[in-house]
Design a protein with these regions (language model features):
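Negatively charged
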Residues: 1-705
Length: 705
């Protein structure tokens, strides 16, 4: 609808026009003849309308008390002439122009001497300039959200009188304006300054004259002020403040901050208070910084990446329940005095010291952790920490210990003697990349509820002794990469391992170079689906018995025994390969094997056999007469460098689907191969001249030299 005719309207006695044209879908609205003499309420009058052209020149507004939300969400209205508005009786202008598209409007005609509520008046607007020098704000009590996310280039509040204002929360949040002068602001009665300058674009915010003796909430006050270089808070009276959470969060260019006069005896929440103050290199906490009532210190110093030292010896923490990520990513922090911390009420220590890459010593022997429920990631990336004594830790309520010591690659001594793991369900990456640990005794661990042990000891590169023989693994589902890259580990006692629920063992022993003995005869799981690379690069293994291994659901057996150089005995008698699709590199470089019994192998679904037996240089005979290869597409280098292989029966081979068969018998100098010429015609030209070929056709052999 283009326009709307109101000429027939008789409104001479109407007092309430709130919502009258709210959400109306018209472009033009001429109200020059609308009688508004008796109207006292114009709130939401044009709220959310589609109006582009609006005529209110003849409005009589002398009696109007409420203009709140009047033009809010008028997204198509660019200009409106309110020069005849008389607002001398208006009390409420809450969100009057909020989220509108108005760009030019003459506000000098507005009389605001009785207005008490200016909440959100210009929030989310794009006025080219806001000249408010005529505004009388002496009666206003609420200015919260007033200029929130206002994109005006010029805002003049130099004549503001704010002595009665109690709420300034979000007042300048997200403001993008030039050279704002706050010197006129009187904050004597303000109780709420939360989010006041959040995400502000200014490099300097002069608040040195602020009176804050009545302020109760400073949460998010300067959060995200990433351009601010200097903040003078030395005169702040914070004696009544209860919430300082996120107060300086994200002030990434703030190098100095004076909080020496902060009185914090009533503060309950300090969550993320200094988070991401990445340029801050010093913080001085005096005795006036009283934390006796604080319950939340989560991420309080997180990502204060320039802090080198922290003295928190005055901190009282007996009521704190959350210390998660408290020092997370304090990358330069070398010393932190938390010797007097009382952690008896703490429930969450997740990532508490995570990524403290320069922390060399940590005195937490007095920590009480009987109520802590989460410690995952607690010490991860503490790359310089050499010793850690957690023998006093009570971990009875912990269910997640994942990545607890991840990347503590300088850690040489770790005391976990009294760890209670009765309720732990997740131990993924728990000791991963503890590259300097040589001995680890976990005999006290109760793992009856653990479901995930993947990557648990990954990259424990110097570990020579690991006591886990008492582990109960009956509930474990994932053991993938559990011992991968334990280069120095020569023995593992796993005979009591119960893997009935395990589905994934990918890479479990990969790169355990020195592992000599491994009794996995008890391993039996009928739901196992992943074992590729399982023993890859176990150079020192001499024997393996997998006769009880249920592999009926396995589809990928690639690289399982690759580079098991010392393997002399391998029992695969009952292996089920009926679902396997790839066997590439399966026995590659098993150069101590002299024979292989693969009579149980069913290869009907296999597509990849490249490098399967390559470099098995001691292998003398191999019976593959039952192998089915009609679906195989790649047999490149399958037997390459099997120098001692004398006889190879591949008479069952059908290579009609094969697309790649380069160097199939490369360097098999002593080999006699038995094959069906008709089924293997594609590979004939790839057989080198030094290989003796015997053809079989209806059980009749012929020899070609």
């Amino acid at each position: 609808m283009e326009s709307f005719n109101i000429n027939g309207f008789n409104t001479e006695n109407v007092e309430d026009m709130s919502f009258l044209f709210s959400l109306i879908k018209i472009k033009t609205l001429d109200l020059s003849n609308l009688n508004t003499n008796q109207v006292t309420n114009m709130s939401y009058m044009f709220y959310g309308s589609s109006i582009e052209r609006l005529n209110v020149l003849n409005f009589q507004t002398n009696n109007v008390i409420d203009m709140s939300h009047m033009f809010e969400n008028c997204r198509n209205l660019r200009n409106v002439d309110i020069q005849n508005f008389r607002t001398n009786n208006v009390i409420n202008m809450n969100s009057m122009f909020a989220n509108s598209s108005l760009q030019d409007i003459n506000l000098t005609v507005m009389n605001t001497e009785k207005v008490k509520d200016m909440r959100g008046m210009f929030k989310y607007t794009n006025f080219r300039r806001l000249i408010l020098s005529n505004f009388d704000t002496s009666q206003v009590t609420d200015m919260s959200h007033m200029f929130q996310s206002c994109q005006s280039m010029l805002i003049n509040i130099s004549t503001f009188k704010t002595q009665n204002v109690q709420n300034m929360s979000y007042m300048f949040q997200g403001l993008n304006a030039w050279n704002m002068d706050y010197s006129s602001l009187r904050t004597d009665n303000v109780k709420d300054m939360s989010h006041m300058f959040e995400d502000n674009s200014f490099s300097n915010i002069d608040i040195s004259f602020f009176k804050t003796n009545n302020v109760e909430n400073m949460a998010y006050m300067f959060k995200g002020c990433d351009s601010v270089i200097k903040l003078n808070t030395s005169n702040f009276d914070t004696s009544k403040v209860t919430d300082m959470s996120h107060m300086f969060d994200g002030c990434i260019n703030l190098a100095n901050l004076d909080i020496s006069n902060f009185g914090t005896s009533k503060v309950l929440n300090m969550e993320e208070m200094f988070k991401s103050c990445s340029s801050l290199n010093h913080l001085n906490f005096t005795s006036s910084f009283d934390t006796s009532k604080v319950t939340n210190m989560a991420s309080m110093f997180k990502s204060c990446s320039s802090l080198v030292s922290l003295d928190l010896s005055h901190f009282t923490t007996n009521k704190v329940k959350d210390m998660s990520s408290m020092f997370d990513s304090c990358k330069k922090l070398k010393n932190v005095d938390i010797s007097n911390f009382d952690t008896s009420e703490v429930k969450d220590m997740t990532k508490m010291f995570s990524n403290c890459q320069n922390l060399e010593k940590l005195n937490i022997e007095k920590f009480k952790t009987n109520k802590v429920e989460s410690m995952n990631y607690m010490f991860e990336y503490n790359t310089k920490l050499i010793s850690l004594d957690l023998s006093n830790f009570n971990t009875q309520k912990i269910s997640d210990m994942s990545r607890m010591f991840y990347q503590c690659n300088s850690l040489e001594t770790l005391n976990l003697d009294n760890f209670n793991t009765n309720n732990v369900e997740d131990m993924t990456y728990m000791f991963s990349n503890c590259k300097s640990l040589k001995n680890l005794d976990l005999s006290s661990f109760n793992t009856q509820k653990v479901k995930d042990m993947s990557f648990m000891f990954e990259h424990c590169e110097q570990l020579t002794s690991l006591e886990i023989s008492s582990f109960d693994t009956s509930e474990v589902v994932d053991m993938s990469n559990m011992f991968v890259n334990c280069y120095e580990l020569d023995n593992l006692e796993l005979s009591n391992f119960n893997i009935k629920k395990v589905r994934d063992m990918e890479n479990i022993f990969q790169n355990c170079y020195k592992l000599k003995n491994l009794d996995i005869s008890s391993f039996n799981s009928n739901i196992l689906i992943n074992i590729n690379n399982m023993f890859q690069n176990c150079y020192s293994l001499t024997s393996l018995d997998l006769s009880n291994f249920d592999t009926s659901n396995i589809k990928d057996m690639s690289h399982i025994f690759e580079n098991c150089n010392d393997l002399k005995y391998l029992n695969l008698r009952n292996i089920n390969t009926s679902r396997v699709k790839t066997m590439k590199n399966m026995f590659n470089n098993c150069n101590s094997l002299t024979s292989l019994d693969l009579s149980s192998f069913i290869t009907t679904n296999v597509e990849h056999m490249e490098y399967m037996f390559s470099n098995c240089s001691m292998l003398e005979s191999l019976d593959l007469s039952e192998f089915s290869t009609e679906n195989v597409i790649d047999i490149n280098y399958m037997f390459a460098n099997d120098e001692n292989l004398l006889t190879l029966d591949i008479s069952s081979f059908n290579t009609s689907s094969c697309q790649s068969f380069e160097n199939l018998f490369e360097n098999c100098f002593n080999l006699t191969v038995i094959l069906n010429k008709e089924k293997c015609s594609e590979i004939m030209k790839e057989i080198p001249e030094y290989v003796i070929i015997k053809y079989v056709d209806n059980n009749i052999f012929s020899t070609l030299f």
